[in-house]
Amino acid sequence: CLACGVNYMDTANYEPENTDDPEWRAIYEKRCKEAGFSAYFDYSWQWAYAKKFEEAGLTALLGSGFDPGVTQAYCAYAKKHEFDTIDTIDILDCNGGDHGYAFATNFNPEINLREVSAPGSYWENGHWVEIPAMSIKREYNFDQVGDKDMYLLHHEEIESLAKNIPEAKRIRFFMTFGQ
């Protein structure tokens, strides 16, 4: 987009196609040590372009789907208009459909499977806490959908919320799945 002089928009953050690429691997391993989470996807690659886009007079809108996207907009609105401070953010993503299959997803199943098989993580007291995949389970009653099991996962909006709502002591993301 920079080379063509056009604005950029995506619905989720960067995830490399080749995780064995030595250049990407070196940056990834450094980030794992410094940040404390091991997800293959994160915003660091895209945030590194911020100054270049600004200097070019271009806009790059990252994570403009629902989660990430709408979830951050709701949190920003709540911070600006509803609360003096935000202590805890829990995002509860519920897929109420089943598509007639045991495993229901409302987006790319390959990405969904990578999310559920990767270690989970959340932001607490200024640092990342990483946990084994799907090791934190909660049940929640979703209006019009009913009781659903949900699992704590790593999800990219936690990164941007931790950066933009630094007073939050804990930020977590939970997702439901078909049983």
Label each region the model flagged.
Residues 2-107:
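Glycine-/Pro-rich loop/turn segments that contact NAD(P) or position catalytic residues
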Residues 81-179:
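C-terminal catalytic/substrate-binding lobe primarily of soluble NAD(P)-dependent oxidoreductases
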